[in-house]
Amino acid sequence: MGQCYYNETIGFFYNNSGKELSSHWRPKDVVVVALGLTVSVLVLLTNLLVIAAIASNRRFHQPIYYLLGNLAAADLFAGVAYLFLMFHTGPRTARLSLEGWFLRQGLLDTSLTASVATLLAIAVERHRSVMAVQLHSRLPRGRVVMLIVGVWVAALGLGLLPAHSWHCLCALDRCSRMAPLLSRSYLAVWALSSLLVFLLMVAVYTRIFFYVRRRVQRMAEHVSCHPRYRETTLSLVKTVVIILGAFVVCWTPGQVVLLLDGLGCESCNVLAVEKYFLLLAEANSLVNAAVYSCRDAEMRRTFRRLLCCACLRQSTRESVHYTSSAQGGASTRIMLPENGHPLMDSTL
């Protein structure tokens, strides 16, 4: 093992990798932070709504929805991690300690790994449900919990490894350009792992598609339901294309630049696009909520109920304030909405 540089500054490693460390806010930095903060806030709000919907509706207390809830939790964590990054980027990067830098990177790696791993778990669970011809899988809750725990153990493992061993503090020639404190091999392994997850998802959803198509074709041979057969097939194709297309659009650019940097491509200008591709990967945490949750009719109804309930409470508070003011300090306040009808708790 060569000399270790545990007492050096962040600037030392950035200079070693050839990555510019800005001393002031450039227009590019401002644009990235503005977009990043916007995406992070949307990710937080959207996934909080998904978690609230799953927790409040007993119909969602099924294994597949537990996995959707875990996906929302992972994406919520990703929003927090990216928000932390936005407050510690640009000129503020130079002021980070080595521990602070590894914390910033570890939060991102852990949350994004958990999100990707949960996508694969959902695909496997859907495959199991379809093959068992069940609307909702009867997978025991204990096994679902073990699956979720496994996802987070793997995510924490990949997220914590760089800070403890998989770094380049003792081998400067192995440092990556995109993440100057990380080993290039770590980036390559992370990119290849994400690519493997995508290929497994393609295989699983392709098998689901052909299985369902064969079953519907058999039904169509015995029952006059050709329009329904066509509708079911097109709906399934649409779902598969949306799921895989969203993953490709959001993750492929980032995976490519990570792999190129991990393989040591000196002629590849990965630093010019890394921030935007990372933002695109973070946007996947917003897309997941739309693809996996908002396409569910019952989930949409629960969203409307939660949002309307919040609006109704706000309207009630305003009505109470107006009524109490009009009565000039009377001790009895009448709680009526603007239409004059009694309020009904929409959660019942």
From Swiss-Prot:
Expressed most abundantly in testes and peripheral blood leukocytes with less expression in pancreas, spleen, thymus and prostate. Little or no expression in heart, brain, placenta, lung, liver, skeletal muscle, kidney, ovary, small intestine, or colon. One of its GO terms (molecular function) is PDZ domain binding. One of its GO terms (cellular component) is cell surface. Signal peptide: none annotated. The chain crosses the membrane at residues 31-51, 67-87, 101-123, 144-164, 186-206, 240-260, 277-294. Residues 52-66, 124-143, 207-239, 295-348 are cytoplasmic. Glycans are attached at residues 7, 15. The keyword Transferase does not apply. Disulfide bonds: none annotated. SMART domains: 7TM_GPCR_Srsx (SM01381). A motif (PDZ-binding) lies at residues 345-348. It comes from the Eukaryota. Interacts with SLC9A3R2/NHERF2, MAGI3 and PLCB3. Interacts with RALA and GRK2. This is Lysophosphatidic acid receptor 2. The lineage of its organism: Eukaryota, Metazoa, Chordata, Craniata, Vertebrata.
